[in-house]
Amino acid sequence: MRRDPAPGFSMLLFGVSLACYSPSLKSVQDQAYKAPVVVEGKVQGLAPAGGSSSNSTREPPASGRVALVKVLDKWPLRSGGLQREQVISVGSCAPLERNQRYIFFLEPTEQPLVFKTAFAPVDPNGKNIKKEVGKILCTDCATRPKLKKMKSQTGEVGEKQSLKCEAAAGNPQPSYRWFKDGKELNRSRDIRIKYGNGRKNSRLQFNKVRVEDAGEYVCEAENILGKDTVRGRLHVNSVSTTLSSWSGHARKCNETAKSYCVNGGVCYYIEGINQLSCKCPVGYTGDRCQQFAMVNFSKHLGFELKEAEELYQKRVLTITGICVALLVVGIVCVVAYCKTKKQRRQMHHHLRQNMCPAHQNRSLANGPSHPRLDPEEIQMADYISKNVPATDHVIRREAETTFSGSHSCSPSHHCSTATPTSSHRHESHTWSLERSESLTSDSQSGIMLSSVGTSKCNSPACVEARARRAAAYSQEERRRAAMPPYHDSIDSLRDSPHSERYVSALTTPARLSPVDFHYSLATQVPTFEITSPNSAHAVSLPPAAPISYRLAEQQPLLRHPAPPGPGPGSGPGADMQRSYDSYYYPAAGPGPRRSACALGGSLGSLPASPFRIPEDDEYETTQECAPPPPPRPRTRGASRRTSAGPRRWRRSRLNGLAAQRARAARDSLSLSSGSGCGSASASDDDADDADGALAAESTPFLGLRAAHDALRSDSPPLCPAADSRTYYSLDSHSTRASSRHSRGPPTRAKQDSGPL
């Protein structure tokens, strides 16, 4: 339902018409600040000025009509008491469209809810229109303008100069005007007025300043709240002129002659002589200012120096950056080199440790490579050479291992001193094995760790060790003088660990290979350690075990025992055996004794090794102990016939022991023999060597269990082979003693004297 126009509404038309003719400000903020009521509304309908209620729903816009406007938004400072969603009547001379939104700048009338337009309505969808209105219609937002102090400028004729006027405050934005000598300046060809920073400042710019432009300038800023002014001065320096001194009165050239002077020169006409002259700007000279005078050389030079300095700084920075980059690259290279060198040194150190002589289970010279074994799995690893003949180096029959600086004692026996002896260094090293009566045990097994050093003996400890070895050697010589002679030597066997080939393999500095002996000790027996100048040569040995020990049980197969004689206890061999047993086994008591050859053949041997590698059979291809030949008659011819045709025996894979079948054959041959081991003469031995007698195979490293089984077997002992043996006699006293013990049979060949 449409509301009827209020009474007296026709009287409003006069006021509306006046509002249409009122001047409007250029700034929207000025209009908003000037108008008493500012609202945003939507046109609901239009009515003619006569108040007729029969107008159509949609009518074209027309001036002098009354519009029904619904208030959508308002500003507190200019609300006029209106509320949102309220409908008011607005008389406007501007064309309006129904259902369109406008910002109305209104003035109240005498009638309530009836307003007239103060300024033309503005479309709120324009650029920042509503925002600009909000900036001015806020509390304490509108201020009068306040200008900053203007700086005076000084320039030369023809230069470009400008004066700047800037407002420090002012809302709405003020408008600017420039004045000189009380006259307002407008834009022209030589003068331009520019605005910047949202019309917050104004600039008066001269394209080419002239002498006439010098003077005082005034800038005025004004808004609806007030105005402010500021003053500034422009100074123009005069330049030299080419006017002749004799010239009279001069005046400026007319427009047609102004082009006579170039480069900003001012043309003058000299009356009287009717000649044109030019007033040249700074830096130019000549009749027409066509020459560059280099007047501003210092100024240009300053710019050039500044540019040169900047260029120099840039170059310095570039060179510094390159140097820093090279330094970083160098540091990275040095770090990488040091790291690589350290890794290479560690690798070489590991390789040297792997080649160190103290490394266990090192492969011996000329021997096959075996996998590394624990000390519990192997007692000794020996490698036998097939082409090296038996050497002349001998080893004493005592089984006590002697080393420098160590002593093993038992409560009831004498102490045994262990010192390594070496008499011929140019040939090879030999081991002197001595054994006291305290080292007697069937269940004892061991491995000795020995390493050969290559350093020179210069330290006091080494000199002391040499002195001890010399003293021990002289003591052993005295003890050997009182002992009966023994004909077989462990060194006579080619496969013996004390042979030249084996010892050289152990003592070669280039192929240092350790040989281990481990002794199982009782829990109550302490151990001791032998120290040497070289810490890598230290040897740890157990003391002597206080139990009984038989020498023959340690080396069961090194020598072939002789077959039994005609009867027990008869013959020179039996006497020698008794003498030997009484000397070495004083506490054995009465009972059956073993043959002398069996005991003598096993002295000085090392314990057997239970570890046998089948792949080594092709390398270690020596023969085992062959059975003795059939009984030889007393004549030399018969002995030659019986010694021919020796039979080879193949050894079995079980710890190098002979098979049971071979043992039975040897037993049958031994029973048929009519004489003992000691009945063979030197001539028979020579004949046996000429006929190719059997060469015994060295099996010195047999297991303890196999050795004990061989010793405790019921089969009679075998005689040792007579080939490739080295015999020795200790001295004249021992020779006489051996002749007394063996009256009937002749003695064997002379052996080498003294250990090597």
Curated annotation (Swiss-Prot):
Gene Ontology BP terms: cell surface receptor signaling pathway; ERBB2-ERBB3 signaling pathway; ERBB4 signaling pathway; ERBB4-ERBB4 signaling pathway; nervous system development
Residues exposed to the Cytoplasmic side: 337-756
Residues annotated as domain EGF-like: 249-290
InterPro entries linked to this entry: EGF-like_dom, Ig-like_dom, Ig-like_dom_sf, Ig-like_fold, Ig_I-set, Ig_sub, Ig_sub2, Neuregulin
Residues bearing glycans: N55, N186, N254, N296
Region (Disordered): 402-439, 557-578, 608-694, 711-756
Any GO CC annotation of this UniProt entry: plasma membrane
Post-translational modification: Proteolytic cleavage close to the plasma membrane on the external face leads to the release of the soluble growth factor form.
One GO MF term attached to the UniProt entry: ErbB-4 class receptor binding
Paired cysteines (S-S): C165-C219, C253-C267, C261-C278, C280-C289
Any one Pfam family match given in the protein's UniProt record, by short name: I-set
Residue ranges, Extracellular side: 20-315
Comp. bias regions, Basic and acidic residues: 424-437
Family from the record: Belongs to the neuregulin family.
Domain notes: The cytoplasmic domain may be involved in the regulation of trafficking and proteolytic processing. Regulation of the proteolytic processing involves initial intracellular domain dimerization.
Protein name: Pro-neuregulin-2, membrane-bound isoform
Species of origin: Mus musculus (Mouse)
Gene behind this protein: Nrg2
